[in-house]
Amino acid sequence: MSDDAKALNRALRGTLWPALKAHGFTFRTDRVAWRYAGDDIDVVELQAVGQHAEAVGCPPLSLSVYVAAYPRFLPREPGIPVRDGRLRPHYWDCDPFRRSLHKTLSQPWFRPFSEQRDRRLLPSLRLHREALSKLIDRTAHDRPDIWYMRDDGSNVDENLRDLTTVVL
């Protein structure tokens, strides 16, 4: 795990996770929290853009946030993680009871394929990248579903305040 990811996880421990705990989300990992009400489960999950950063046009630690519900009447699929006897579904396990959240901040800095972060591409991936870059709007724009985390970390606090407000 990179130092930047560790710093982001520390910041989450000081903002979002305590706020969610106050609302009954008592179990969590670094990027997922669960709330249990009988056999019903609520999920809040954060996903870093990661390896898709170049195509999305933002730094890899920029975040998407999903909320989901896993009601007792959904079939219990095999493969859903269990810890201490409790299901720990991810947002994608909760279909159709999931949604992506949208930020309230204006961040018109997304520029797909404006820089190549990983130069060690296989020839087939390089061709795929070139084809995608011709199809995707490469002008600067905003994305409502992704909190843009600047590489220098200067807007992490602002993003986490907005993210926490939107989640709650």
PLM regions: where:
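Intrinsically disordered, low-complexity regulatory regions enriched in serine/threonine/proline
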Residues: 1-15, 27, 34-168
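Pyridoxal 5′-phosphate
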Residues: 20
